[in-house]
């Protein structure tokens, strides 16, 4: 059980690190492109406020 909890904590830390790195290098998170060689990952977010 401790190993499972440690893996979840590690995953959360990695996700938070990725978000903080994106915020530091970009002015917003609505559009993020990551290119490695010939591979590109693009993430777009859209929302509507009520």
Curated annotation (Swiss-Prot):
Q: Which residues lie on this side of the membrane: Cytoplasmic?
A: 1-5
Which InterPro entries does the UniProt entry name for this protein?
A: Hok/gef_toxin (IPR000021), Hok/gef_toxin_CS (IPR018084)
- Known consequence of changing residue 15 to S? No action on toxicity
Variant or mutagenesis effect after changing residue 30 to S: Prevents dimer formation
Listed A to Z, the keywords are: Cell inner membrane, Cell membrane, Disulfide bond, Membrane, Signal-anchor, Toxin-antitoxin system, Transmembrane, Transmembrane helix
Q: What else is known?
A: Interrupted by an IS186 element, which silences the locus in strain K12 MG1655.
> How does the record comment on the protein's domains?
The periplasmic portion confers toxicity; dimerization is not required for toxicity.
The gene is hokC
Query: Which residues are listed as membrane-spanning?
Result: 6-24
Protein name, UniProt field: Toxic protein HokC
User: Which domain of life does this protein belong to?
Assistant: Bacteria
One Pfam family in the UniProt entry: HOK_GEF
């Amino acid at each position: 059980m401790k190993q499972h909890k440690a893996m979840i904590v590690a995953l959360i830390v990695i996700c938070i690190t990725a978000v903080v790195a994106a915020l530091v290098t970009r002015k917003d998170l609505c559009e993020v492109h990551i290119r490695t060689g010939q591979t590109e990952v693009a993430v777009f977010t859209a929302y509507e406020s009520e």
